[in-house]
Amino acid sequence: MGLCFPCPAESAPPSPSPEEKRAKLAEAAERRQKEAASRGILDIQSVEAKKKKKEQLEKQMETSGPPAGGLRWTVS
C-alpha cells in the first residue's frame, strides 16, 4: 500500500520567513518587468540612450519656452 502521511519522526522542511518570501517575490517581479520591457528589443542600451536623449530634448524645450519668430495665432 502507498504512504499517505510522512513518518512521524520526520519534521517538515523549514519554511522561509515572511520577510524572505516578500524579498524573493519582489526580486522575481522586478526580473519579470525587466524581461517584459526588453522583449523584442535586440540592443537595449541603444533604446535607453534614445529614450534619455528624447527626455533631455523635451526638458530643454520646456525650459527654453516657445521659439522666437515663426507663426503667431491671434484671435480678434
Curated annotation (Swiss-Prot):
Single GO molecular function: ATPase binding
Stretches for region Disordered: 1-76
InterPro entries, A to Z: SVIP, SVIP_metazoa
Covalent lipid adducts (S-palmitoyl cysteine), residues: 4, 7
The keyword Transport appears for this protein: no
Entry comment describing in which tissues the protein is expressed: Ubiquitous. In the adrenal gland, it is expressed in the cortex at all developmental stages.
Membrane topology per record: Lipid-anchor; Peripheral membrane protein
GO biological process, any: negative regulation of retrograde protein transport, ER to cytosol
Keyword flag Cell membrane: yes
Source organism, top-level taxon: Eukaryota
Keywords: Cell membrane, Endoplasmic reticulum, Golgi apparatus, Lipoprotein, Lysosome, Membrane, Myristate, Palmitate, Phosphoprotein
Biased composition regions of type Basic and acidic residues, renumbered to the chain: 18-37
Description of how the protein assembles with itself and partners: Interacts with VCP. Forms a complex with VCP/p97 and DERL1.
UniProt function note: Negative regulator of the ER-associated degradation pathway (ERAD) of misfolded proteins. It competes with AMFR/gp78 for binding VCP/p97, and inhibits AMFR/gp78-VCP/p97 complex formation that is required for degradation of ERAD substrates. Involved in the regulation of adrenal cortisol and dehydroepiandrosterone (DHEA) biosynthesis.
Family: Belongs to the SVIP family.
PANTHER family for this protein: SMALL VCP/P97-INTERACTING PROTEIN, SMALL VCP_P97-INTERACTING PROTEIN
Name of the protein this chain belongs to: Small VCP/p97-interacting protein
Source organism (scientific name): Rattus norvegicus (Rat)
